[in-house]
Regions:
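Active-site-proximal N-terminal segment of extracellular/periplasmic enzymes that hydrolyze or transfer
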Residues: 95, 100-105
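A short, structured beta-strand-centered segment in the mid-to-C-terminal lobe
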Residues: 1-9
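C-terminal cap/loop subdomain of S1 sulfatases and analogous C-terminal strand-loop tails that border
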Residues: 10-13, 18-86, 90, 95, ...
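Generic anion/oxyanion-binding catalytic loop in active/binding sites
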Residues: 1, 22, 102
Length: 135
């Protein structure tokens, strides 16, 4: 099935459980994307991407730790320990050839996407019940 809906790898387990007719466990972070495959929903407005590289490359002094938020219009990536990042307008530049990070015209967009990224990171936590005893 071809769809333009955005989904994340954290949605896989929720989708498998949904297909099997099982309820997701308490605290699962993903959401089933089966309705998006049927065209019944758009699923997510944005996705969060974490990339932790195994070693330094591409001119970086250390292994890349990258956090990205992507929606239909923008891709915004920050690199740990670096004073630069990446900002691409995916509607005007779908091949991501023009990095807008240092362009002052887009400073408001950088601020907005930074806030979205911080909010997403802030709400990442395991909400499953804690164990009653030590293992």
């Amino acid at each position: 099935v071809l769809t333009e809906a955005m989904a994340s790898t954290i949605d896989l387990s929720a989708s498998i459980l949904d297909r099997a007719g099982l309820e997701p466990f308490n605290g699962i972070q993903g959401r089933s994307f089966l309705n998006a495959l049927d065209g019944k929903s758009s699923h997510r407005d944005e996705v969060f991407i974490e990339h932790n590289d195994g070693g330094p490359r591409m001119g970086l002094k250390q292994a890349a730790r990258v956090r990205t938020i992507r929606n239909k219009k923008w891709r915004f990536s920050v690199f740990a320990g670096e004073n630069w990042g990446e900002l691409y307008d995916l509607e005007d530049d779908p091949k991501e050839t023009k990095n807008l990070w240092h362009d002052p015209i887009y400073s408001h967009q950088k601020a907005y996407l930074s806030l979205q990224l911080v909010e997403y990171l802030t709400f990442q936590m395991d909400e499953s019940p804690r164990a009653m005893r030590l293992a």
